[in-house]
């Protein structure tokens, strides 16, 4: 394996260097946006992203539905914990108008697809390796979620995911 020697220092593997570079790019992408759609009642920024099956995932086509948008990455532990809950919410409330959309932010879709093979999603998956959508939404960490009303306006936002968050998030979805 190739090794890189940073200035004045220890040897790092090329893989470690790549991972650090990707983390810095993602951190910069997430920190770059200062505008936030999180003002309740603000119009949610539109998105048009490639989906898991190749079809476009467009927020505009979900108008009239309650949309739970979750921003996630394959390396995010709490993201992995949130998937069974999101599967459950889609199954329980989908017939009542809920659409869960998971927006993956991995630089390589292969990383996301490996994650999805281990942790299946029974909801819509979209890919945004450039990070334009989280910038538009003012996302600073993962997982982060935004609930968008049938009128296309932001109803709620949440950062993180723990077992304790389940009840709070479900209450918001039920309203």
Regions found by a protein language model. Name each.
Residues 80-119, 129-136:
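Structural microenvironment flanking redox-active thiols in thiol-disulfide oxidoreductases
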Residues 5, 10-23:
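Bacterial N-terminal signal peptides that target proteins for export
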Residues 62-65, 95, 121-122, 139:
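Active-site acidic short loop of glycosyltransferases
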Residues 20-46:
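N-proximal helix/coil linker or "cap" segments that precede and/or mark the start of modular domains
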Residues 65-67, 71-75, 141:
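Short pre-active-site segment immediately N-terminal to redox-active cysteine/selenocysteine motifs
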Residues 114-122, 128-172:
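Thiol/disulfide oxidoreductase modules built on the thioredoxin-like
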Residues 40, 46-67, 93:
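A short beta-strand-turn-helix
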């Amino acid at each position: 394996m190739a090794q890189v020697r940073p200035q004045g220092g220890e040897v790092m593997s090329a893989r470690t260097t790549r991972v650090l570079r990707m983390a810095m790019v993602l951190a910069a992408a997430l920190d770059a946006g200062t505008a936030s759609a999180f003002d309740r009642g603000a119009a949610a920024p539109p998105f048009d992203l490639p989906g898991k099956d190749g079809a476009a995932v467009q927020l505009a086509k979900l108008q009239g539905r309650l949309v739970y948008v979750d921003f996630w990455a394959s390396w995010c532990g709490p993201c992995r914990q949130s998937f069974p809950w999101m599967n459950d919410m889609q199954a329980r409330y989908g017939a009542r108008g809920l659409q869960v959309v998971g927006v993956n932010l991995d630089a390589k879709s292969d990383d996301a697809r490996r994650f999805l093979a281990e942790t299946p999603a029974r909801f819509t998956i979209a890919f945004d390796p450039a990070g334009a959508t989280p910038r538009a939404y003012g996302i600073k960490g993962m997982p982060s979620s935004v609930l968008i009303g049938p009128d296309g306006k932001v109803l709620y936002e949440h950062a993180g995911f723990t077992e304790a968050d389940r009840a709070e998030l479900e209450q918001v979805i039920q309203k």
